[in-house]
């Protein structure tokens, strides 16, 4: 009985590359959907709420409050919109390339986190480039906190997820090296 010939290694490499590229396109689609959601919410707020107007969203938790921000998070660097716009553009291009090339995104979770940061950077970049400021609308009513938008949620979620994942995997690697060192030879 004859055995089937083994698949040449280059074929499996090509299949893995093809699968990776497919997932990369799915991440780009997810980023595009997140940017679209961000822009739709911002457009709705700009068209339906006066600047400074507040409306309940989730009672006793969060309200829609129309404000604009020429700076970064918590209005930092509000006199340097041009610099923030440039940095956002560079970051957006870098993250697109990072996903495509596989830089520091070794698995699906890290790819998701980078996709979220990409979407947030691109969403706020669109506002800065088009209007010179970013529309913010979500305001916690139960505590004093900065007003934020969908893009900000994406950036913060992606950064926290990626940082947590990196710390967790580093912790696991450190402990596995310790266990290997303690194992009798």
Predicted regions and their residues:
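Alpha-helical transmembrane bundles and membrane-interface segments of multipass inner-membrane proteins
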Residues: 2-185
């Amino acid at each position: 009985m004859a055995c089937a010939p083994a698949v040449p290694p280059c074929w499996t490499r090509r299949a893995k590359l093809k699968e990776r590229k497919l997932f990369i396109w799915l991440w780009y689609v997810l980023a595009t959907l997140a940017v679209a959601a961000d822009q739709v919410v911002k457009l709705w707020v700009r068209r339906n709420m006066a600047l400074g107007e507040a409306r309940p969203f989730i009672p006793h938790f969060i309200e829609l409050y129309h404000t604009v921000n020429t700076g970064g998070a918590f209005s930092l660097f509000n006199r340097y919109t041009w610099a923030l716009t440039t940095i956002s553009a560079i970051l957006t291009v870098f993250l697109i390339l990072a996903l495509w090339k596989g830089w520091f995104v070794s698995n699906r979770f890290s790819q998701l986190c980078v996709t979220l940061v990409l979407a947030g950077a691109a969403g706020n970049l669109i506002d800065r480039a088009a209007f010179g400021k970013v529309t913010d609308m979500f305001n916690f009513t139960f505590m004093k906190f900065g007003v934020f938008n969908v893009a900000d949620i994406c950036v913060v979620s992606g950064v926290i997820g990626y940082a947590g994942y990196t710390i967790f995997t580093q912790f696991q690697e450190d402990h596995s090296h310790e266990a290997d060192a303690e194992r009798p030879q």
